[in-house]
């Protein structure tokens, strides 16, 4: 006998079924590829897409929306554009381009999307921050006042860099720009500064060499390398510096110190020019787009020294949600952008732009490099606009006369080429200048602690080296500093701890210098 279903049962079954029904359907905003080529895709649809939003193409290729036009969207592809074809479906991801950050990034080599490329497995970090972010406002900053020692005598004495500063390294190819940046990274060992090295458009072999150098000197443990090599697509070279800045900002906003090296921004500008022309943006001077200045200014303005007041720091503009509970005051992000000039032309478009954005520049010259002066810094036209406030008192004291002596030496040297009969005082000045130039020479990857720099520059500016043979100056420096370290460590530790050159220490140093010069000359004769 069949049992009849009662109407009230039917209604209760229907109610149960309806209660479990999800009324919301997943709505995907999708578009269609109209045209693709040269790493650029034109997409129809995606009417609600945001500028800088990540897009998902077939075959796991990611892209980013850059041009939002009336009837289509211009996007750049972060992978092989051969995998994408006309008519393909493109999905919005609803997330702006971002990168993982945190301590787990240290010691790793990544691409600009935050994916590891060093074969050491995945990176375990939960925090992701957007690539593009507004720089901190004036209220949240503090003036630069702590030194960032590079370990290079010529820079720390005459072109000092402070934490939170932007100092440009500029010069022709093969003048030692990368070497200056790497020396600075190696010198941060044990100083609590996290470093980020961004390689833009360099050869893959060069990046591998940089990583090997950093590993050899134990610097990789506090360094992240962001690599967009010459073989990577232009969009990756364009976003690489922003990825480096974002990793550095995590340390800056959590009350720590970070140093980011962009090597080099001229290649980023070329990649951006390529993208802009392919997106049919109007070209300007040297065919660069009109906003190439803004490209570099918005990047370099993110380097800052943050206020010590934690309550003010917590209200920082554009602070991403994951960072809010971690914010501390007093952090800094220092930027060392690198620009390559063509035949020493610093008045070209990109060099003048970046010179005007940064707080000073270090000029490296090929003729000085070829003459054996390394680092090949032209002290006359190199400048640090804010670093003076960050220099330790001891260095300020000895370096003031150094800059003046060198300037006079350069002037006299130019005149002395014309005349052979020089008076005694001119000859003495030329001799001292030549020895000071010799002191400032330094080997690669052997940064010097600031207290040793102060000691040897003091000996040079006091004229104690005037009687030492020019060819023996480097040997004298090595032996004198080794003697100080072994027999008189209290002198070096006093300079290091107090940051000043006390009068009693100065007179003791001078006395030791005079004695050592005499014994050194005796030894040399023998």
UniProtKB/Swiss-Prot annotation:
Assigned GO CC terms: plasma membrane; proton-transporting ATP synthase complex
Keyword flag Cytoplasm: no
GO molecular function, one term: ADP binding
Site location (Required for activity): 382
Membrane topology note: Peripheral membrane protein
Signal peptide: none
Keyword DNA repair: no
Similarity section: Belongs to the ATPase alpha/beta chains family.
Oligomeric form and interacting partners: F-type ATPases have 2 components, CF(1) - the catalytic core - and CF(0) - the membrane proton channel. CF(1) has five subunits: alpha(3), beta(3), gamma(1), delta(1), epsilon(1). CF(0) has four main subunits: a(1), b(1), b'(1) and c(9-12).
Protein known as: ATP synthase subunit alpha
Species this chain originates from: Chlorobaculum tepidum (strain ATCC 49652 / DSM 12025 / NBRC 103806 / TLS)
């Amino acid at each position: 006998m069949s049992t009849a279903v009662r109407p009230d049962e039917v209604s209760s079954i229907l109610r149960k079924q309806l209660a479990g029904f999800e009324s919301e359907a997943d709505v995907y905003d999708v578009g269609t590829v109209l045209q693709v080529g040269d790493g650029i895709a034109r997409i129809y649809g995606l009417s609600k897409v945001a500028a800088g939003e990540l897009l998902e193409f077939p075959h796991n290729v990611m892209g980013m929306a850059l041009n939002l036009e009336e009837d289509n969207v211009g996007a750049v592809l972060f992978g092989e554009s051969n995998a994408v074809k006309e008519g393909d479906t493109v999905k919005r991801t609803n997330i702006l381009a971002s990168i993982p950050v945190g301590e787990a990034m240290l010691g790793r080599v990544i691409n600009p999307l935050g994916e590891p490329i060093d074969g050491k497995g995945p990176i375990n970090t939960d925090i992701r921050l957007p690539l593009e972010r507004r720089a901190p406002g004036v209220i949240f900053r503090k003036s630069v006042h702590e030194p960032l020692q590079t370990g290079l005598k010529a820079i720390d004495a005459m072109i000092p860099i402070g934490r939170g500063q932007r100092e440009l390294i500029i010069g022709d190819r093969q003048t030692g720009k990368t070497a200056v940046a790497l020396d600075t990274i190696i010198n941060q060992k044990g100083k609590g500064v996290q470093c980020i090295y961004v390689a833009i458009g360099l050869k893959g072999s060069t990046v591998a060499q940089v990583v090997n150098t950093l590993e050899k000197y134990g610097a990789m443990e506090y360094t992240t390398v962001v690599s967009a090599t010459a073989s990577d697509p232009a969009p990756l070279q364009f976003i690489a510096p922003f990825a480096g800045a974002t990793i550095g900002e995590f340390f800056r906003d959590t009350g720590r110190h970070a140093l980011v090296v962009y090597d080099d921004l001229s290649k980023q500008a070329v990649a951006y020019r390529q993208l802009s022309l392919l997106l049919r943006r109007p070209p300007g001077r040297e065919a660069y787009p009109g906003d190439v200045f803004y490209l570099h200014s918005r990047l370099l303005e993110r380097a800052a020294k943050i206020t010590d007041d934690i309550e003010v720091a917590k209200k920082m503009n554009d602070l991403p949600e994951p960072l809010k509970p971690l914010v501390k005051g007093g952090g800094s992000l220092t930027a060392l952008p690198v620009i390559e000039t063509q035949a020493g032309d610093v008045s070209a478009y990109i060099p003048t732009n970046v010179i005007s954005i940064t707080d000073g520049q270090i000029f490296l010259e090929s003729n000085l490099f070829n003459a054996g002066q390394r680092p090949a810094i032209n002290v006359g036209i190199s400048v640090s606009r804010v670093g003076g406030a960050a220099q330790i008192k001891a260095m300020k004291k000895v370096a003031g006369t150094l800059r003046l002596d060198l300037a006079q030496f350069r002037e006299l040297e130019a005149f002395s080429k014309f005349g052979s009969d020089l008076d005694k005082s001119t000859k003495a000045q030329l001799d001292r200048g030549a020895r000071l130039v010799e002191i400032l020479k330094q080997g690669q990857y052997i940064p010097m602690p600031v207290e040793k720099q102060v000691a040897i520059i003091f000996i040079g500016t006091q004229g104690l080296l005037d009687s030492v043979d020019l060819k023996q100056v480097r040997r004298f420096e090595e032996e004198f500093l080794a003697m100080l370290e072994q027999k008189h460590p209290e002198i070096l530790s006093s300079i290091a701890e107090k940051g000043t050159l006390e009068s009693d220490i100065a007179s003791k140093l001078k006395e030791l210098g005079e004695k050592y010069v005499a014994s050194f000359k005796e030894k040399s004769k023998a």
